[in-house]
Amino acid sequence: MLRVFGSLTRSRSSSVLSQDDKIKQILKQAHDFEIALQAMDYVLDDRAEEGLALLKKNEAEDGSDQTINVLARGVIEFLEATLGFEAEEMKKASETLAKAENLSLKSRQYAQKNDLKSSSLYAPGTVYAVTYTESCLLHALLMIFSESYVETAKALLKLRKAYYMLQEIFEEMKKVKQTNGNMSIYKSETNHSEASVDSSNASFSSVDIPYELTREESNNSLYQESAEKVQKMRVRRLTGSHIGNTPAIDRLRSELGLDGPKVTTEENSNEYSALSENMDFSQATIDEFIHSGVNLCYGILQVVLSLLPSGIGAVLSVVGFHGSREDGLRLVWRATKQRNIHGCIGLLGLMFYYDGPFQFTDADFDIPVPENELKKTKSSSTYEEGDLDGPTLLHPGKILEDALLQSRALFPHSALWLLNEATMLSGQGRLRDSVKLMDSIEADKIEMRQVKSLLIFNRALTLVHLHEYERAADDFLSLLDISSWSHSLYHYFAGSCYLEIYRMHQLGVRKSDRPEHFKQRATDLIFGAPNLLTRKSFNARPLPLDRFMLRKVDQFKATQKRLKLSDPLDAIATSPVHELQYFYNGYNRMGKQDLELANIMLTEYHNPAIDAKEPNQEMIKDFLVSLTYRRLDRAEEGCELLDRNVLPKIFTMVNGKVKYFKKTEDPWLYPSALYERSLFSWKLKHMDGLEESKEWLTRAQGYADDYELSTRVEMKIKAAIDRVDESL
């Protein structure tokens, strides 16, 4: 095959391309895109080295498409960076994606200049417009994930470039659909059992060549051999057999969990058995890449824009740069229907949106979509037959489960998809099932170090929600040898776990045979954590949670000095592990017994710092206790506690207007308390409380400030406001 594609290429320095040159380059381009898609799938199966080796081998070939090779490497590095959030990995991914941006613009210009049309539906160079926007988007997301106002502002300039180009391509896609009489452009009418290469009578046609061949061209054996190769690569990729795994259909389960039943199939499976009846085997590789790439990138971009703080969003809207959360989610869902990297990244993005730490869809904010909103959904500019309606977009339930289970079947070696299944189980309150699933894989055998560290970190969090603190601390400390993300936070989190073990022993809730050991470990780790703080973050500044940790330890030291305490642990009032749990959605994931234990530890434990009743520490304690009440079906008590002990210290009403008391001790608390108060209004009054909920959310949004967790808190507030607005 190297001989075939070597003879099918020619130097791009040529000023004029013949028809023969064009066919050769078109087929080589389709081949290189299939190679790139295969390489990225290796990564999704926890075999990154195999994927990178495949790209390296292809890059060395004469006439190889460097643009898609570099983008594929950038996507692999992006996944590694966003899974681990390590400074060096994020820097490396950013540099590669920047290179992919430049190459994409050059390749697009080359295709346009030479009228090199590689798609039967779109203008020359369109596929490189997609690679450009994908590079820009992923690069900008790395900047946004820094959770910094400044970096977010810089990212917006990059997103703006991608936005207008994506908008242009998306409008072209709609025109193509209308021209084809509203027939789907994503699935052709060709029966998938028929190869798109017909070699009968020594002639052929190929969906990857976007125009009709002459008799001489259709008899060209080199064209035919390369076209057949591309078609076989595509079929193997679509069925999941391209990376050497046994038939995915044999591993497909119908339910989540380690013991979930398998899907029964009537026919004997083979390596070409598809997981979905909607699989299109006859769509050209370049067209598939364009469709899935635009749906993914334009969809993610719209969701991100819809979640930006209102101040930034309002400015962007003036210049026509705005996003729709519903339209964006619908496009991302559409991308997941494609069996390629775009579909998988789309699914990972949806998992982050529905079950991630930012709580974009809070379990307590289960507002139904009104009838008029369903009609609006169908009239949306992005809506197509077969898309998800409003309620399903908000709570996809089984549809999201099934999509994840398909990825679990396709990529059996990957701890990444196993981790996402565990996260989904946690989101359903099945914490022990989640830990059991994560324990089923041997961490040391996970090839991708970032996935290994992420799985251990998430297992530690789940164990914290279960109050299994000793094992959680062990997991946090084990990360010191695996991940460079935040050694200071790992120490602080582990120390907070040991402190809670010591407190439970003191209170008699759970006796320990080594209380003094845990006490000393808590002291060493909590107060020693700032010493590990380095400036290794992507943007040369401490990470948000590092700054949070540093502020907390400074508070503890100040309290110890003020109260003249000999034991530094006596200077810690509200349990730091319960405070940390709020940032990781812990109170929405705990079961009844776990919530009751959290309530006991927050309300019944005493030490000198707690008895001193420092106002801000009392606010944190009462805030967290109110959440346990709400989740324990004692919402009235929780709301009363919040109204009486927390909110009056945050704001007051003067002549009908809100006057905030700007506080700096724990800046995450104040807007979060206003946000949670809106959920109490919904929980207690349901639809009758929506106006009141909106009022509380507006107040939460008004308490804007640039603090260590501002991006996380404000995105959550913005998502809730949009959700309420849809139902008012």
UniProtKB/Swiss-Prot annotation:
User: What biological function has been recorded for the protein in this entry?
Assistant: Inclusion body (IB) resident protein that interacts strongly with lipid droplet (LD) proteins. Involved in LD-mediated IB clearing after protein folding stress, probably by enabling access to the IBs of an LD-stored soluble sterol derivative that acts as a chaperone in inclusion clearing.
Q: Where in the cell is it found?
A: Cytoplasm; Nucleus
GO CC entries: cytosol; mitochondrial outer membrane; nucleus
What does the subunit section of this Swiss-Prot or TrEMBL entry state?
Interacts with lipid droplet proteins.
List, alphabetically, the SUPFAM superfamilies matched: TPR-like
- Tell me the organism: Vanderwaltozyma polyspora (strain ATCC 22028 / DSM 70294 / BCRC 21397 / CBS 2163 / NBRC 10782 / NRRL Y-8283 / UCD 57-17)
- Record's PANTHER family? TETRATRICOPEPTIDE REPEAT PROTEIN 39 FAMILY MEMBER, TETRATRICOPEPTIDE REPEAT PROTEIN 39C
Gene name per UniProt: IML2
Domain of life, per lineage: Eukaryota
Q: What is this protein called?
A: Inclusion body clearance protein IML2
